[in-house]
């Protein structure tokens, strides 16, 4: 009997140990992902490719960062709370299948027990430690604390004596026990919370026992009811645990001891087949044995299921208090909840499989949270790279056009203003004349009321010296000139207001955008541009702020009055004298000469401003040229270095998450083989039945990067009826043994065949055209996302069971901004501009035209023009020279042939948009259906056409 129990103990220990060991292996992969991610992000932050506010977002959120730190740094631990000391001791003894905790009777529950920390050690040993990890050395030599030879942990080492119960240090001390046990050897730790310790609350015990570990919470009970104190403790525990689930373990003895004894014998017999050599067998064998044992456990549970009135109190109490769902719902939910919805549950102590399952799911919960957080960070970085690449490409394309636009608009403004000054001189003279006539009386009145400054004038208005008379005259002149200047210039501004509004607004916005791009460098060029605009074109501001334009008018008008001879010294400088001086000045104005002078000065100033503007714009263009070269270098580095590295990390993080959630897919028969991988069938994975698994073994970093980028673009595309959906991915690190590259398994929805096979199987023309319409719709969807497929061909179009087409193999698919001009694709489908390295999404239109040729031809033979080419180079040369597939009669009607020719036009600008292609192809498809119906080929044409219209809508 003892040998049977020992064998059963090892089997259960290995089962839980296997889960913990598996968790450790997955954690090791997670640590590598985090390490590589930190290195990559550190390099990004020091690269000066992104602004500070963008760099600040490349971090994990605080909550996610905390959980990632816990999972990667702390070992997993079972933290056992309980209703009584005996229930906790029973659970620990059940886990280890030996009496580590000695139980005398129920009186043990009234005693004070300190916390116990079980972890791995080469020898069995115990010691007392404080929270700060210092060992208590004040025990007597030879005391039980120093013993290292025991079967069960001595009670005296866990029991707090009465004389020590008022000693806070002794109460808070922890009994640390080391065991050489397979379960603890996997770095699992077990912590048992203190019992009946005065002054130590549940929250304090929780904080101490969960410190520096990754907790899995268990609460055991062995009484028929929970006391009010138990319920308060549970509520406090729930508040401390937050979102962490709690497993309630029923440690009560079975109601039928004899039946329980027979059931234990049956379980022991079932587990006895294990021996020491099979402790870490293959996953398949372990999983098979586990399923067999779970089946046995299920049968046993059915046999010992209690009656409805048999001890339901505790579960009802837990349900009413909200700690668990109702007993019926708890039974239905058990075993079917996914990891994201793991909840509190109740299990029987003897249902070890369910307990192990809860522990496994709790550990998975930690891993999934970490993997999800890391994957979200990787996705954020990838989206940032793509957005940045688009911004950089736009900057490279738009900046030269902005500079050219600014130059063109400035020239137009210069020519318009120059013509204005040449044509408006007579109007300007009339403007000055009318202005003077309108304001003469007002000027005379203001002159008569003027009070001289800095002059000594007697009360009678007498002036004694000729010098003072001259100064009085000058002040009257200044007054009249100032008023005259303001009115003349105000009307002068109105004559060029239309030009100012027509040219300056757009020109200023264009220059402002150029200066904003160069805003970090406050150079003389930027300042000069602003000064030129203010001085040359913003006439209103310059005049009103006493700029040089005002000074020009001021000085010229002063010259006209210099010839006025001073009056004889009057006896009185009164109002009449002031008005007379002002009237004399107005009478001596020469409007023609003044208008000519103003126009001449304005032309001179305009020419100088134009030359200065052109020089400054050339300097700005040179600066932007250097900056754009640096921008192109940054774009290439983002595309070639940072994006592939982060895409690979994103692939690894999501693959690890899928591995934790759904496990390794079981590969069945081979259903396809391509250049880069093999495709297998898979019965079910991740809740999806009938999957296809594409197994790829990247031989080097370049292939790894290409695969990662393909997966990123495929996975980031929203679900669409015309794109083959990717379900998930798993990385098999054990593929090929040590030192070999791991295999990447991409799981996709299972399709029936490809278009190449369908055409060989003599698919009818209307159905082939229907598939071509599906392809056009799928490519249009990719283009709407800014993606270019670059490899549209027959074998990359898969058909479902209804012969509807879906595009697959996005290995060459990229956003336009992320393309480097590399030559990719299938030679016969490659547009001529692909060989130059400068192309856009119209290459997909070209490839679609070639695909349409095969669709209408009804066979998969090479076009005769291409069949004569000896090799790829010969084929590419012919394509660049304009060689295209020939027209087949009578297969091609005029509409289909013209659509093909326009699609594969040599100039990308001459190719139609895919929306236009789809519209014309719809007409061709409708005619094909009508023709088949007219020939008696079937009555389903109208129905198919109606279905297609519905799909299109």
From Swiss-Prot:
Pfam families named among the record's database cross-references: Pkinase (PF00069)
Active site positions: 791
GO MF annotation, one: ATP binding
UniProt-annotated location(s): Cytoplasm; Cell membrane; Apical cell membrane; Basolateral cell membrane
Keywords of the record: ATP-binding, Cell junction, Cell membrane, Cytoplasm, Developmental protein, Kinase, Membrane, Nucleotide-binding, Serine/threonine-protein kinase, Transferase, Tyrosine-protein kinase
Protein kinase domain: residues covered: 665-926
Coiled coil: none
UniProt entry tagged with the keyword ATP-binding: yes
SMART domains: S_TKc
CDD domains: PKc_Dusty (cd13975)
Database matches in InterPro entries: Dual_SerThr-Tyr_Kinase, Kinase-like_dom_sf, Prot_kinase_dom, Protein_kinase_ATP_BS, Ser/Thr_kinase_AS
Known catalytic reactions: L-seryl-[protein] + ATP = O-phospho-L-seryl-[protein] + ADP + H(+); L-threonyl-[protein] + ATP = O-phospho-L-threonyl-[protein] + ADP + H(+); L-tyrosyl-[protein] + ATP = O-phospho-L-tyrosyl-[protein] + ADP + H(+)
Gene Ontology biological-process annotations: cellular response to fibroblast growth factor stimulus; embryonic organ development; negative regulation of apoptotic process; positive regulation of ERK1 and ERK2 cascade; positive regulation of fibroblast growth factor receptor signaling pathway
The name this protein goes by in its record: Dual serine/threonine and tyrosine protein kinase
Lineage: Eukaryota, Metazoa, Echinodermata, Eleutherozoa, Echinozoa
Gene name per UniProt: DSTYK
């Amino acid at each position: 009997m003892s040998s049977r129990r020992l064998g059963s103990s090892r089997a259960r220990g290995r089962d839980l140990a296997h889960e913990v060991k598996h968790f450790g292996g997955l954690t090791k992969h997670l640590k590598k992902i985090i390490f590589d991610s930190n290195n990559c992000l550190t390099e990004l932050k020091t690269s000066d490719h992104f602004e500070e506010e963008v760099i600040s977002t490349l971090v994990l959120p605080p909550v996610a960062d905390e959980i990632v730190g816990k999972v990667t740094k702390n070992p997993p631990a079972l933290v056992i709370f309980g209703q009584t000391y005996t229930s906790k001791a029973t659970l620990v003894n059940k886990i280890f299948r030996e009496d580590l905790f000695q139980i005398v009777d129920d009186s043990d529950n009234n005693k004070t027990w300190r916390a116990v920390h079980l972890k791995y050690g080469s020898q069995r040993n115990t010691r007392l430690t404080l929270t700060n990890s210092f060992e208590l050395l004040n025990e007597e030599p030879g005391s039980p604390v120093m013993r290292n030879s025991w079967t069960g942990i001595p009670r005296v080492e866990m029991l707090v004596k009465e004389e020590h119960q008022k000693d806070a240090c002794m109460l808070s001390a922890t009994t640390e026990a080391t065991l050489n046990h397979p379960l603890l050897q996997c770095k699992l730790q077990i912590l048992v919370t203190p019992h009946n310790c005065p002054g130590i609350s549940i929250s304090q015990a929780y904080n101490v026992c969960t410190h520096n570990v990754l907790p899995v919470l268990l609460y055991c009970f062995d009484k028929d009811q929970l006391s009010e104190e138990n319920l308060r403790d549970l509520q406090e525990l729930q508040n401390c645990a937050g979102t962490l689930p709690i497993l309630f373990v029923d440690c009560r003895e079975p109601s039928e001891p004899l039946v329980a004894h027979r059931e234990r014998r049956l379980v022991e017999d079932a587990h006895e087949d294990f021996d020491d050599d099979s402790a870490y067998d293959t996953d398949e064998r372990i999983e098979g044995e586990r399923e067999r044992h779970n089946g046995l456990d299920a049968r046993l549970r059915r046999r010992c299921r209690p009656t409805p009135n048999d001890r339901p109190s505790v579960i009802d109490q837990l349900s009413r208090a909200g700690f668990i769902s109702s007993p019926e719902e708890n039974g239905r939910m058990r075993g079917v909840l996914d990891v994201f919805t793991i909840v509190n549950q109740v299990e029987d102590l003897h249902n070890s499989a369910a307990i192990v399952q809860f522990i496994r799911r709790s550990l998975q919960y930690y891993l999934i949270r970490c993997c999800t957080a890391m994957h979200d960070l990787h996705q954020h970085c990838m989206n940032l790279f793509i957005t940045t690449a688009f911004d950089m490409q736009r900057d490279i394309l738009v900046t030269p056009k902005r500079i050219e636009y600014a130059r063109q608009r400035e020239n137009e403004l210069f020519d318009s203003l120059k013509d204005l000054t040449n044509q408006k001189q007579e109007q300007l003279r009339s403007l000055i004349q009318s202005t003077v006539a309108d304001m003469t009386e007002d000027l005379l009145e203001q002159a008569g009321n003027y009070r001289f400054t800095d002059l000594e004038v007697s009360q009678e208005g007498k002036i004694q010296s000729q010098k003072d008379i001259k100064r009085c005259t000058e002040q009257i002149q200044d007054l009249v000139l100032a008023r005259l200047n303001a009115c003349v210039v105000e009307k002068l501004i109105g004559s060029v207001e239309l030009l100012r509004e027509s040219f300056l607004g757009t020109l200023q916005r264009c220059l402002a955008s150029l200066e904003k791009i160069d805003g970090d460098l406050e150079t003389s060029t930027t300042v000069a541009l602003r000064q030129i605009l203010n001085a040359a074109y913003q006439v209103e501001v310059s005049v009103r702020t006493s700029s040089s334009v005002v000074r020009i008018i001021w000085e010229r008008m002063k010259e006209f009055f210099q010839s006025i001879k001073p009056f004889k010294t009057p006896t009185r400088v009164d109002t009449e004298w002031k008005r007379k001086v002002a009237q004399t000045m107005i009478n001596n104005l020469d409007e023609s000469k003044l208008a000519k002078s103003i126009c001449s000065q304005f032309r001179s100033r305009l020419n100088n401003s134009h030359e200065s503007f052109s020089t400054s714009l050339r300097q700005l263009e040179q600066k932007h040229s250097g900056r754009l070269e640096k921008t192109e270098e940054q774009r290439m580095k983002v595309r070639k270095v940072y994006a592939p590295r982060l895409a690979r990390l994103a692939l690894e993080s999501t693959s690890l998450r899928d591995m934790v959630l759904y496990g390794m897919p079981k590969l069945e028969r081979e259903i396809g083989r391509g250049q880069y991988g093999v495709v297998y069938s898979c019965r079910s994975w991740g809740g999806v039945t009938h999957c296809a698994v594409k197994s790829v073994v990247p031989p080097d970093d370049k292939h790894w990067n290409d695969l990662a980028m393909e997966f990123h673009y495929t996975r980031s595309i929203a679900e669409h009826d015309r794109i083959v959906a990717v379900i998930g991915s798993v990385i098999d690190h054990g593929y090929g043994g040590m030192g070999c590259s791991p295999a990447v398994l991409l799981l996709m929805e299972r399709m029936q065949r490809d278009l190449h096979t369908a055409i060989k199987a003599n698919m009818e023309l209307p159905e082939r055209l229907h598939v071509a319409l599906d392809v056009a719709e799928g490519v249009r969807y990719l283009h709407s996302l800014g993606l270019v497929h670059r490899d549209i061909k027959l074998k990359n179009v898969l058909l479902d069971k209804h012969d509807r087409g879906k595009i697959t193999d996005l290995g060459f698919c990229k956003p336009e901004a992320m393309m480097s001009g590399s030559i990719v694709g299938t030679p016969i489908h490659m547009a001529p501009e692909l060989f130059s390295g400068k192309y856009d999404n119209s290459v997909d239109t070209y490839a679609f035209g070639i695909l349409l040729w095969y669709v209408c031809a009804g066979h998969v033979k090479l076009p005769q023009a291409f069949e004569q080419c000896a090799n790829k180079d010969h084929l590419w040369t012919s394509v660049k020279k304009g060689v295209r597939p020939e027209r087949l009669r009578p297969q091609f009607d005029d509409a289909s042939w013209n659509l093909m020719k326009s699609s594969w036009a040599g100039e990308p600008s001459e190719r139609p948009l895919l929306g236009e292609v789809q519209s014309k192809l719809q007409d061709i498809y409708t005619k094909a259906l009508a023709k088949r119906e007219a020939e008696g080929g079937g009555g389903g044409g109208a129905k198919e056409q109606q279905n297609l219209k519905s799909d299109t809508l």
